[in-house]
Amino acid sequence: MSHHVTFNDLPQGGEKFEPAKGGKIIGALGLVGVLGLVASAFFFFTKTDTFAYSWLFAVFFTFTFVVGGCFWILLHSASNSSWGVAVRRIWENLANMILAMGIFAAPLLLPQVQKPLYEWMGHHRTAMEHAAHADHPTTVKESLHHMSVENPHLHALVTKFGYMNLNTWFSWYTRFFLYFLILWYIARTLRGKSLKQEQDGDIKHTISARQFSCRWLLFYALTVTFAAYDWLVGLDYLWFSTMWGVYIFAGCAWASMGLTILVITWLRGLGYMKKVVTDEHYHLMGKLLFAFTVFWAYIAFSQYFLIWYANITEETRFYLTRNTEGWRWVSIFIVIGHFVGPFLLLLSQPRKKNPVVVSLVCLWILFMHLVDIYWNVIPERGPSLGIGVWVPGAWVQDIAALCAVFGTMGFLYLRGLAKYSLYPWRDPRLIESVNVIN
């Protein structure tokens, strides 16, 4: 920037987004969302078994951006960072999409969707029926134990009953609602403190947000970890990984930062935030992208290495499935596209400071995150349904679900930017953020 920016250089009341200015992209996302919803409704009623995997893929992919936005607000507040003040409202808007996200996740509560996705739930429901009609008082766990005599694989469900169950106080259903409640509470509380500060400009709201974030970071971490286990690891109840929660978290943080950069670049192209966000902010966000590129690779390799070294049948199946037929090439592509490519592109400081270049890298990052989530969910579909490695034509269902969820959520998110100022204009540290040099 050519000079030191002061509060007098910024518009009173901040900058309010006018949806009409971004009408083309917003309208396109809305249209894609509507078409996707119509197609998804058709597939839901005609091809429920295969479409259930498509919907889970689309929901979880979109969910990662929402929880990623929540993470960046928590980290920004807990670390008492000042540079992120200028872009914090973008994260707040993203995190506060959690209720809309819950609506899209609601179909996962339906038995007809759970049946093809989670085999263990079918066994539990059978055990519940046996327990209900038993001649003498029998618990569901005891019923599962009796069933495991004929099917030895069910011994795993007996062992994991305390976590993988449908009828206790800590059941899958209880946790499902708890995840959204916790994330909603975090997002709503931090947004509330931010808006109160716009009324009086008092630093006490910043201090309060920091104290709140330090307490709730742990609950956030547990929420993301447990949700990742329930929705994805549960696809194969025999499989387990101690690295899974961190693996998913790394992808959430990586992709949500990429989306943040893209949204800011888009807004600046429309004439917003030009005095607030500088090349220095792009450099800082680019460095975080680079850091999480390496961190994700470290966690992904660690998970693979631990499973390869232990060579336990229940664990190795995950990678064996993804090294079969065409999935092997997808696995290799992820190694190159998710790590090697972004790593090399983000090494250079000038590239990280160039909004156009770093935004193009972010487009690639979003695509690779999509491939990564697809690779984690979809390979389970064919074997679980007894169809084979690939399900012919199911990719159309995957695209329909993605358009429905991501398109609609994108439309709602961009429209929601108009509700408040694009940056917290009365935050006492805003000027420090605007003039940041690193």
Could you tell me what each predicted segment is?
Residues 422-438:
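Short, highly charged, low-complexity non-transmembrane loops/tails of multi-pass membrane proteins
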Residues 3-10, 36-37, 62-81, 183-188:
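Central hydrophobic cores of alpha-helical transmembrane segments in multi-pass inner-membrane proteins
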Residues 222-226, 363-374:
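Aromatic-anchored segments of alpha-helical transmembrane domains
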Residues 66-73, 103-107, 176-188, 250-265, ...:
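Hydrophobic cores of alpha-helical transmembrane segments in multi-pass inner/ER membrane proteins
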